[in-house]
Amino acid sequence: MYLYIETLKQRLDAINQLRVDRALAAMGPAFQQVYSLLPTLLHYHHPRMPGYLDGNVPKGICLYTPDETQRHYLNELELYRGMSVQDPPKGELPITGVYTMGSTSSVGQSCSSDLDIWVCHQSWLDSEERQLLQRKCSLLESWAASLGVEVSFFLIDENRFRHNESGSLGGEDCGSTQHILLLDEFYRTAVRLAGKRILWNMVPCDEEEHYDDYVMTLYAQGVLTPNEWLDLGGLSSLSAEEYFGASLWQLYKSIDSPYKAVLKTLLLEAYSWEYPNPRLLAKDIKQRLHDGEIVSFGLDPYCMMLERVTEYLTAIEDFTRLDLVRRCFYLKVCEKLSRERACVGWRRAVLSQLVSEWGWDEARLAMLDNRANWKIDQVREAHNELLDAMMQSYRNLIRFARRNNLSVSASPQDIGVLTRKLYAAFEALPGKVTLVNPQISPDLSEPNLTFIYVPPGRANRSGWYLYNRAPNIESIISHQPLEYNRYLNKLVAWAWFNGLLTSRTRLYIKGNGIVDLPKLQEMVADVSHHFPLRLPAPTPKALYSPCEIRHLAIIVNLEYDPTAAFRNQVVHFDFRKLDVFSFGENQNCLVGSVDLLYRNSWNEVRTLHFNGEQSMIEALKTILGKMHQDAAPPDSVEVFCYSQHLRGLIRTRVQQLVSECIELRLSSTRQETGRFKALRVSGQTWGLFFERLNVSVQKLENAIEFYGAISHNKLHGLSVQVETNHVKLPAVVDGFASEGIIQFFFEETQDENGFNIYILDESNRVEVYHHCEGSKEELVRDVSRFYSSSHDRFTYGSSFINFNLPQFYQIVKVDGREQVIPFRTKSIGNLPPANQDHDTPLLQQYFS
């Protein structure tokens, strides 16, 4: 036994040293400096060293002895700065070990890779000491960033995984209850920089079910010494719920970084395919270590992940996704094999061998190596391919849930956040601008863009066509348009938000008299000035809340301008009665078309078009209907006007009208249900009525009808039906109502006799059920199951995608005031919070 253990320790140390050497060899001097000095900076604490702060900051790493590089650094400090570094006191030190995890030291580590560091500490550190250590780590992150190296520290209590502590998708965590999968990744990718060896590696795979007993036997026999090992626990069996939660989180991460996430997504899918008897990859690597089979290029965790995914996809004969995952792997490794290198490193040698096995030719390598120069056609093809792969994983995940009798509402808040993010990123809707470049190519800019209008009655359908070339007949005739839409606003928005249209792009337009080049250039300048391309990703809180309009542009008279008729005409009007909506003797409306362009709190970009005399009324009703009553006002509201005449007057009047209506919509209360705005358009009077859940429009022919409409709205206020005429919705439900979403609100009754349910459908029609009995959890599960199965809403197809599942809320009282919070099942809601004092937020780097 003793010789066996000693052999294992030697293999462990050899593999660990190999990984350290590989991590350093792949990176530049700044990374090497940070990587080498981090243990020293955590072991010591001195004012002249990075990371210093006042207070009783825990210092000292168990079993740490500075190596030659670290000793040289300390000697330099003593020699040139005249400082004396004191060793921490003897005995059990507070930091049990410092480890990297993730792609560092693997073939997947690239020149742009960041560092994820686990700082494992003793469980006896108190709350204040943990906070001080966390602050020191934050200072070290800033120090590394100043050198151009991205480092993320995670404080890990050595007993954390034994306590089954959990977080949620909304925090700096990896969703609901994913401890075993997190340990799986740590155990297969960890590199010890300093401190104790990892005990789990010493326990044979066939003893995993009796992990603690086997460890105690080793200690009792004196084969191992307890205080020399980091023990985070064994890899026990995984629940179906954990696979489901982990896969949700991985899909969530993959939306923003699809190439980076494909491999991990498919590893989880492979695990679920083998369920209930999966072979965790960490166990596979450990078995190879115990058997002395140092395969896969030194048990490289990234290569072994590819090997497992390849095995799975080959078994299910999914060669399309197998080809995709190989390309993702190649791009992640970032060794351009089509270009000659004087020095052939180990990563290049590994990749060359794999590419040879895959049978790739030079043309494919050149295409992949040219990714930085991919333009819209290649990017759109890649986007569709990644989307198909992601939706296939999503479908398989839901099938796994059904096969194992899991409710998709096991954690309704998590799935709510994920479905909203999928909905925002991928649901194809009329007027929505699809963003096709999620970190696929760095630059889609085009030197030339041409917009061509085809009027009705031609062979091609009427509308606008966009080409990425100058408008000569040969180039246009022989090429397909990049994009088509009936309205110019949508095409300009698509080109701008996808990065094709920049300040350097030459614009051309064949507008058939509708829009000329100066007007197009004005619009492009306005949109680019008021709508930044890069914004922070929406927070989980924003995704779980009803979407709110953040940036709004109202574009007036872009495609149809009534004032163009004023040219060479005498127009009679009274300067004292300059009403642009009912202008001059003929009371003409000077607003002929309105385009809306807005970005919401989910970072969706939407466009809408209205034309004709009623375009202003229709646009107002539509945009106000998208603002729920408790929404924050938009961050910006801009009016762009492109009239030939009276431009300033029209813009000012529209701006005043829109601002006034938004104020009326967002300030309306239940006590003021009769608020309205009268507007005269083309000689006719219209009333905009600001009701609790929406905005209605009514034509008012005469004074009696006008007064009657106002009185009716004052008395009743609601245009929707409830259970009885006497039932009133709670104010918080009114404020949370959001069109396009099915919402369930649970409210405990005052006499504690059951609960009430308020249901708002996509059009904000209301149903109310009083004194319900039974289990809310079962209701949530059944409703979620119905919606996920009846419309196959989790399935991607060419004709229909709908990720927008019903949302569930609980009405609670906090300090005497009613509030709406996400409904959580008891099994989830009673878990400890993710951010207790003794807990570092864990772990954004899992599945990153």
UniProtKB/Swiss-Prot annotation:
Q: Please tell me which top-level EC class this enzyme sits in.
A: lyase
Q: Where is this region: Catalytic?
A: 1-535
Give a yes or no for keyword Chaperone in this entry.
no
The protein depicted here goes by the name Adenylate cyclase
Q: Which GO terms describe its biological process?
A: cAMP biosynthetic process
Q: Name one GO cellular component term.
A: cytoplasm
Q: Name one GO molecular function term.
A: adenylate cyclase activity
Q: Which residue windows are transmembrane per the record?
A: none
Q: Where is this region: Regulatory?
A: 541-848
